Amino acid sequence: MLNKNIKLTQFSSGAGWASKISAEELTQVLSKLNSIRDNNSKGFESLDDCCIYKINDKESIIQTVDFFTPIVDDPFTFGQIAAANSLSDIYAMGGKPLFALNIVAFPTQKLNLSILTDILNGGLDICKSINIPILGGHSIKDDVPKYGMCVTGIIDNDKILKNNTAKALDDIILTKPIGSGIITTALKKSIISSKQSKQTIEIMKTLNNTVQEIISDFKINACTDITGYGLLGHINEMAQSSKLTAEIHFDNIPIIDGVIELAKKDI
């Protein structure tokens, strides 16, 4: 087996969210599926962050699954970021997470199992911080490490936040600065400073559970989680599904330090 200190990012051709199938390709496939639905269920048709299943007149269960390849080299940190990302979909719908299941792909013949332990402990650390249990999961052998979670949550039926219900003249609110994709690409190429890396890692492993605070301060009509398709991709998806257009002023966008300079270098 390889040394425990090996760089995890060298095992993936695309960093994390960049490995996602494109929205166009995904839509092409999903449009050909004739799925079963009833009045209590809502699935991928609206491209919301979670599926919804109404359990009574007051509440619904919401569920999401998310996993990706390493975007940082430290296994514990990778686990933290992957868990925070999985939980983010629940928060984007306005829900409360109840429990999680781990999803693991790991090259057991190439990497020490202690690395997998560290990844899982990273995910556990995030879940412990909000007092939700990890009740199980599923694992397979794979040449490329992958980790994420299936998260189940609950939400009041009259408080569900969807991504296709934006209204004209709505303001756009971001809970975090953007640019993590560019930073992680630069990290894989070892061309960013330790300060930039630490700042971005802190942002990525921070939970988006401030949504409830924002809801109490503003009337939120629609919400989504910005990940693999970036700000423009997700705003476009939200605007089109709401039959609107969006106007974004570059100077008003919170951006991680150093991202603009890296973008100018085609990173």
Indicate where each model-derived feature is located.
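Helix-biased detector of long, well-ordered alpha-helical tracts
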Residues: 1-267
